[in-house]
Swiss-Prot record:
The gene is RPL5. Component of the ribosome, a large ribonucleoprotein complex responsible for the synthesis of proteins in the cell. The small ribosomal subunit (SSU) binds messenger RNAs (mRNAs) and translates the encoded message by selecting cognate aminoacyl-transfer RNA (tRNA) molecules. The large subunit (LSU) contains the ribosomal catalytic site termed the peptidyl transferase center (PTC), which catalyzes the formation of peptide bonds, thereby polymerizing the amino acids delivered by tRNAs into a polypeptide chain. This is Large ribosomal subunit protein uL18. GO terms for molecular function: 5S rRNA binding; structural constituent of ribosome. Pfam families: Ribosomal_L18_c, Ribosomal_L5e. Disulfide bonds: none annotated. Component of the large ribosomal subunit (LSU). GO terms for cellular component: cytosolic large ribosomal subunit; nucleus.
């Protein structure tokens, strides 16, 4: 009968011996992994293209939500680094009539609609694929016409954000899909999805700011002082629970009318210099010659 080996048990904790061999063979993680900025497991699958699609980029819809802004970018990977095709930001929405609430779900949808129409315009596909003009909150997938070019396809890149149901990231996704972009997705993470099906009315309510309007009414009834403090910018801009939906409808129409980015105006700055400008080589030689000449004249005068 063979004897059992005296191997290490699976549940035993073994301290790492950090000797010379350990440090000699140690390989650090990628810098952005060490900083907790990039999930390389997910990034690899979002960037690697099919092997039968030669030199065809795999486009990603990169969405990042900050405290004061929502950032949406269409990007693809290259060895030199990611290339940004186009981008859209929630801080552009005041140009289309949405001056407040730039980080809520409704603003996320509008930002997605903006980048979707913008990238289609860039590739000359905006007239072929109009997307979902009448927003109803239900599922919508852009179907390619056999006689025409296929619509622009990209994949959602959420980064390290938590992909919970109703997250604003999926508002950008829905706006992009309704713009006419071919983006694979499921309705499971949209607001209003419960018990295996999507409540389109609840989702539409979020797209047009209905949930914000309901909270405004509730807070105004319960605590008017808190309402005036929390919605001071809404009150200043004349936005209330009754006209908030109309504001977003007008914004969607304005985005479809002109999604192109606003041209940057270069600022002319008058440069001020507080120290003496550096003189050129020719000026230095002339200055030395002048000093020498004055010295020689002084010597001759003394003689």
């Amino acid at each position: 009968m063979a004897k059992k080996g005296r191997g290490r048990s699976k549940g035993t904790f073994v301290a790492v011996l950090k000797n010379k061999a350990y440090f000699k063979r140690y390989q650090p993680k990628f810098k952005r992994r060490r900083e907790g900025k990039t999930d390389y497991f997910a990034r690899k699958r979002l960037c690697v293209q099919d092997k039968n699609k030669y030199n065809t980029p795999k486009y990603r819809l990169v969405v990042r939500v900050t405290n004061k802004d929502i950032i949406a970018q269409i990007a693809y990977a290259r060895l030199q680094g990611d290339v940004i095709v186009t981008s859209a930001y929630a801080h552009e929405l005041p140009r289309y009539g949405v001056s407040v609430g730039l980080t809520n779900y409704s603003a996320a949808y509008a930002t997605g609609l903006l980048i979707g129409r913008r990238v289609l315009q860039k590739f000359g596909l905006d007239s072929m694929y109009e997307g979902q003009i009448e927003v109803d909150g239900d599922e919508f997938y852009e179907e390619a016409d056999a006689a025409e070019k296929a619509s622009f396809r990209c994949y959602l890149d959420t980064g390290l954000a938590r992909t919970s149901t109703g997250a604003r990231i999926f508002g950008v996704l829905k706006g992009c899909a309704d713009a006419g972009i071919d983006i694979p997705h499921s309705p499971k993470r949209f607001p209003g999805f419960a018990d295996g099906k999507l409540n389109a009315e609840a989702h539409k309510d979020h797209i047009f700011g209905g949930h914000v309007g309901d909270y405004m009414e509730k807070l105004e009834e319960e605590n008017e002082e808190a309402y005036k403090r929390q919605f001071s910018r809404f009150i200043k801009n004349g936005i209330n629970s009754e006209n908030i939906e109309e504001m977003y409808k007008k914004a969607h129409a304005a985005i479809r009318a002109d999604p192109s980015p606003k041209a940057k105006v270069e600022k002319t700055v008058d440069k001020k210099r507080w120290n003496r400008a550096k003189i050129s080589y020719a000026q230095r030689r002339a200055r030395v010659a002048q000093v020498k000449a004055s010295f020689l004249r002084a010597q001759e005068a003394e003689e």
